[in-house]
Design a protein with these regions (language model features):
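Bacterial N-terminal signal peptides
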Residues: 11-22, 590
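Short hydrophobic alpha-helical membrane-anchoring segments
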Residues: 18-26, 598-599, 603
Length: 606
């Protein structure tokens, strides 16, 4: 279909960009309510770049744990005073593996997923995968247990009751090595594809593992049935048991079920934790952008939001869940991810796809040949691309999505992320930080020279996510890995999310010419997000912890605003026990009514 332009370019430019693109004014661009935001209290610096990936929090000790893959350790940080986070100790994982990927905490027990490097045959260079481990330790960093899991443990999660730990074993393909370490061998026939796994570790009431993990695989699933349903199984020569790559874990409120993203497969796995067994795998489908807005090119020289008949493959990274009126919903950050190895790659620019026999319209085919339109947009030669091509696909959905637990979309904000940033952050729109620069401040400054650089790929790239309950309301906090910053949505109604705020202190500081000394102002590439409820918080106020991969910083935010104040006030009013005076009962009931009435009025006004 012909793109419909809904944007008007102007000469407005804010910030210190050396490459000034025109600001984009969207007639119906989303505007946040302004009643909820994030206030940075303090930032922990991991001691160098690339030293903060995933963050966890333990309410019992008021300590957070930050995975540091660069140094293969977990930093335990005291945040009893969030304005002054203090390193307690660093837990070295080198004795147990070669890289720490995920970390979780519950009731004084911490666990990290640690991968082990593969070995390579000296004659052929063929790789043999080595399963990783889950390392248990306490708030002082004392290691208690090391439990074997699957290959390449990634996300780690506790069940809410603390009796299970679930570990996603990604089991990524391994190309053979050329010259024993001199690079990847291009021959796909020499590659190996380890099994993807989900490990379930049972714990006693003190958080001590009972024994070995139940390492679950996908052998019971029929590969062709899954493919027919839309699950992307396509590594040459692999079936479901090897091809599926568990990425991120969330566990239901009743601790009975785990939901695990299978990012490259664009699917969700469902795990019965009581059995335990993987009971289902369902495909997520694609997102139609024909009536949404996106910039599809990094070569058009401007912010150019248009709608195209392109489908986004959700391919979520992080996932969380929440329950409303007894119904569980999943919330995903739709990053998108391709397989791109020396021995196999599915990546292709739309201009380079083979359109022989294609049923696409002449206008769309012409757009794919133009680098300023669709030609630069990254796509796939694998599923769901057909031969001949009848539909165009791109990585990710540039959004978050709320799903029912049978795979139906309940809510997605469409193109609101991209529309809002185009209008309010035009000098950093779809920017990319130069990760080869020596300081976080220089990386942030480089984004002003890299405007539009990610438009041909995944846009702002939503990757991290957490859901939190504050009073009677639920909020989603979504981290944009490339664009930076956190999107905040009220998702109390799972079918109708409300945009509350976008917080990007690093870009705000750069635009203002600041020195990046205040908390949160030198964060680059947010990866992990953790919500801390008011009841668990050392300040008795809800917090959001955000770990930033490139800058190596982790910032502690307080969730603030008029709506939050009203919710906390309403939820803190407790009616006196039976036998109290009628006057006190009337007073307490009145306070509760006033608080709720004020909250309702604010919501209606918004």
């Amino acid at each position: 279909m012909r793109p419909t332009h809904r944007n008007v370019a102007s000469a407005v430019a804010i910030g210190l960009s050396s490459l000034l693109l025109p600001a984009t004014v969207i007639a119906d661009a989303p505007e946040p309510s302004g009643s909820v935001t994030l206030t940075a209290l303090g930032t922990y610096d991991g001691g160098g770049l690339a030293r903060a990936e995933i963050v966890a929090f333990d309410a019992r000790s008021a300590r957070m744990a930050v995975s540091n893959d660069d140094l293969n350790r977990v930093d335990i940080v005291d945040i009893s005073d969030p304005t002054s986070p203090t390193l307690v100790t660093s837990v070295d994982m080198s004795e147990h593996g070669d890289g720490v990927n995920g970390v979780a905490a519950h009731n004084g027990v911490f666990v990290a997923g640690v991968e082990r490097d593969p070995s390579y045959d000296e004659a052929t260079g063929v790789a043999t995968a080595d399963p990783g481990v889950a390392v248990f330790f306490d708030a002082d960093g004392e290691i208690s247990d090391v439990i074997g899991v699957g290959v390449l443990p990634d996300s780690v999660g506790f069940s809410p009751d603390g009796r299970k730990v679930v570990v996603a074993g990604e089991g990524e393909p391994l190309c053979a090595t050329a010259d024993l370490g001199g690079g990847e061998e291009e021959d796909i026939a020499l590659a190996t594809d380890p099994a993807g796994t989900i490990a379930v570790i049972s714990l006693n009431e003190d958080g001590v593992p009972h024994g070995v993990a139940d390492v679950l695989g996908f052998d019971a699933f029929d590969t062709e049935v899954l493919r027919a349903s839309g699950v992307r199984i396509f590594w040459p020569g692999s079936d479901a048991s090897n091809d599926l790559e568990p990425e991120y874990v969330t566990v239901s409120a009743d601790s009975s079920t785990a939901y695990v993203t299978l990012q490259e497969a664009n699917a969700i796995a469902v795990v019965n934790l009581d059995t335990p067994e993987i009971t289902d795998v369902w495909a997520l489908g694609t997102k139609d952008f024909s009536n949404l807005l996106m910039d599809a090119s990094n070569r058009d020289g401007e912010i150019n939001l248009e709608n195209w008949d392109v489908r986004g493959i959700y391919m979520p990274d992080a996932v969380d869940n929440y329950t409303v009126n007894g119904v569980t919903y999943l919330v995903t950050a739709n990053e998108g991810d391709s397989r791109d190895y020396d021995c196999y790659s599915e990546e292709e620019r739309m201009a380079d796809l083979d359109y022989t026999g294609s049923t696409l319209s002449a206008e769309i085919l012409a757009a794919t040949a133009d680098d300023a339109l669709l030609g630069r947009l990254n796509s796939t030669t694998a599923m769901p691309t057909s031969d001949p091509i009848d539909q165009l696909y791109m990585w990710g959905a540039r959004s978050f999505t709320i799903w029912t637990t049978d795979g139906e979309v309940a809510y997605d904000p469409g193109s609101e992320f991209e529309e809002y940033i185009a209008e309010h952050y035009p000098n950093y729109f779809n920017a990319n930080a130069d990760d080869e620069l020596p300081t976080a401040e220089e990386m942030i400054a480089s984004m002003a020279d890299e405007v539009d650089a990610r438009s041909d790929d995944k846009g702002g790239e939503p990757e991290g996510l957490a859901v939190g309950r504050i009073g009677s309301r639920y909020y989603a906090f979504v981290a944009l890995e490339r664009q930076g910053g956190i999107m905040v949505y009220d998702i109390t109604d799972p079918t109708n999310g409300q945009f509350e705020a976008y917080v990007n202190l690093a870009l705000d500081e750069h635009a203002a010419g600041g020195d990046h000394s205040a908390p949160g102002t030198k964060d680059v590439s947010p990866e992990g997000v953790k919500f801390v409820s008011a009841s668990d918080s050392p300040t008795s106020k809800p917090l959001v912890l955000v770990s930033n991969e490139l800058s190596g910083t982790t910032t502690i935010y307080e969730v603030t605003g008029s709506e939050i104040d009203a919710e906390l006030t309403a939820s803190s009013v407790t009616l006196p026990a039976t036998g109290s005076s009628p006057q006190l009962l009337v007073l307490a009931s009145g306070l509760l009514a006033v608080g709720l009435a004020g909250l309702i009025a604010r919501r209606r006004a918004a």
